[in-house]
């Protein structure tokens, strides 16, 4: 009677004791307070749907091909694909931990059987099953962390592609700007060379002082040196682009020689609400998923401190052959149902829980910092874009005015009404204004590229959630 009461007591109290061990993981979502509106002006007349492949609007088919080629050979994209595969494998392993495991065993031997007192051949085969019953959700929390990190890895794959597209677009814009400035430098060198030639003829005829002719020759030499330096910079940019894309350099130079249409003034638009743009940033999404994964790992670490329940079983068959007689044996078992209760581990489990909590705090801090950084990057790109728009008309007017002034001064110099010093001064200002206009056009395109990258490159968080299925992730990795 006493034994029966004891069994009843433990059977009643054990579920209550287990249920009392509640696991309280930190929140999977960390609240943030992005600004309600952008402080910098937004670009107008662009389309929100044009962000994903905005570079197709530039009228530069070469850029489209270069970006596709760079994304195909980029080590960053390949690394992101590898991390998706790693995260997928971790997810499969974490889900498998929730299921029973089944192992097959087989063996055969021949020797002296003590029970039969003779030589016998023994063979046996069986199946061994085991299952850890996830009482406190440790394995479920591990699976949740794996799911979150897989979603984050998929987002980072898109970010890698966005980074490559932005880098190639920036490098191509820099190269085309360099080539435009090279044309300006070569025209200037040709003009100064002609001035030096005419000054030399005038000097030999006795109409120009030797010092003035020397100034013209020095100016021509300076222009040649500047053109040579500019050509070197362009060659360096070409080789950088070759390394990014894997193109052959002769083919790239041939394509660069073809004329390209001027880029439109407005390429795309972004959402008016900062929260909407933040939702399209893959790095912000990954940081958010890392917080959720760290939260799940805290729950898993806490669950390791509580009892664990496992169930095992087996089924098998054996046969023994001795002296021409074969004996068959079949066995099966269910159990034991084993309960493991941690009593003392020197504080190891508590320390692991504290470490998981510290990682969660770190992930939450990094997530908030990532949100602030994303807002700052968008704001900075908008400011640069607005600044280039405001300066464009003035820079164009200045370049046209200084060019007209130089043409007039050159005509006066040819007629003997202006000195060579006046001509060179007008030339310097015209050259500086023309180079400034070319640089401003590059700066504006660079601002568009920075805004494209800061706005997430057209990524969609809802699409990322849908891509959490194995088939979708495999398709994306390809």
How would you label these PLM feature ranges?
Residues 2-72, 147, 231-279, 321, ...:
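Terminal intrinsically disordered/low-complexity segments used for targeting and assembly
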Residues 60, 73-76, 132, 179, ...:
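Short loop-to-helix capping motifs
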Residues 63-65, 122-124, 170, 215, ...:
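Transmembrane beta-barrel architecture of outer-membrane proteins
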Residues 67, 124-128, 172, 274, ...:
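Membrane-embedded beta-strand positions in outer-membrane beta-barrel channels/transporters
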Residues 139, 155-273, 384, 388, ...:
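Periplasmic alpha-helical coiled-coil/stalk elements that build and connect Gram-negative outer-membrane
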Residues 203-207, 413-417, 454-458:
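A short glycine-centered flexible hinge/capping loop motif at secondary-structure junctions
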């Amino acid at each position: 009677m006493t034994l029966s009461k004891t069994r009843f007591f433990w059977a009643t109290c054990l579920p209550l004791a287990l249920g009392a061990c509640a696991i309280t993981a930190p929140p999977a979502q960390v609240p943030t307070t992005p600004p309600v509106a952008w402080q910098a002006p937004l670009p107008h007349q662009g389309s929100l749907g044009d962000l994903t492949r905005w570079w197709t609007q530039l009228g530069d088919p070469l850029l489209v091909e270069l970006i596709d080629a760079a994304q195909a050979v980029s080590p960053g994209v390949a690394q992101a694909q590898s991390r998706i595969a790693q995260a997928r494998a971790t997810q499969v392993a974490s889900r498998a931990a929730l299921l029973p495991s089944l192992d097959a065993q087989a063996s055969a031997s021949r020797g002296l059987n003590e029970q039969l007192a003779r030589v016998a051949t023994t063979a046996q085969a069986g199946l061994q099953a085991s299952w850890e019953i996830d009482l406190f959700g440790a394995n479920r929390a591990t699976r949740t962390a794996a799911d979150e990190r897989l979603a984050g890895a998929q987002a980072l794959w898109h970010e890698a592609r966005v980074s490559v597209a932005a880098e190639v677009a920036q490098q191509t814009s820099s190269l085309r700007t360099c080539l435009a400035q090279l044309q300006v430098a070569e025209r200037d060198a040709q003009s100064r060379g002609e001035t030096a030639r005419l000054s030399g003829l005038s000097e030999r005829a006795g109409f120009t002082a030797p010092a003035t002719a020397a100034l013209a020759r020095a100016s021509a030499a300076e222009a040649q040196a500047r053109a040579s330096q500019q050509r070197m910079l362009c060659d360096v940019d070409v080789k950088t682009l070759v390394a990014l894309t894997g193109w052959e350099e002769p083919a790239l130079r041939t394509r660069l020689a073809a004329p390209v249409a001027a880029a439109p003034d407005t390429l795309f638009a972004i959402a008016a609400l900062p929260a909407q743009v933040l939702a399209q940033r893959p790095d912000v999404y990954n940081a958010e998923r890392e917080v959720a994964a760290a939260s799940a790992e805290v729950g898993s670490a806490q669950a390791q401190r509580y009892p664990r329940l496992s169930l095992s079983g087996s089924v098998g068959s054996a046969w023994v052959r001795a002296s021409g007689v074969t004996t068959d044996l079949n066995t099966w078992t269910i159990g034991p149902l084993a309960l493991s209760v941690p009593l003392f581990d020197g504080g190891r489990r508590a320390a692991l829980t504290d470490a998981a909590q510290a990682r969660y705090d770190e992930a939450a801090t990094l997530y908030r910092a990532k949100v602030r950084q994303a807002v700052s990057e968008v704001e900075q790109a908008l400011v640069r874009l607005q600044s280039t728009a405001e300066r464009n008309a003035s820079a164009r007017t200045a370049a046209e005015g200084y060019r007209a002034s130089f043409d007039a001064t050159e005509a006066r110099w040819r007629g003997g009404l202006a000195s060579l010093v006046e001509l060179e001064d007008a030339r310097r200002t015209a050259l500086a204004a023309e180079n400034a206009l070319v640089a401003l056009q590059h700066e504006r395109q660079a601002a568009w590229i920075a805004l494209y990258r800061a706005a997430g490159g057209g990524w969609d968080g809802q699409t990322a959630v849908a891509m959490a299925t194995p088939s979708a992730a495999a398709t994306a990795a390809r």
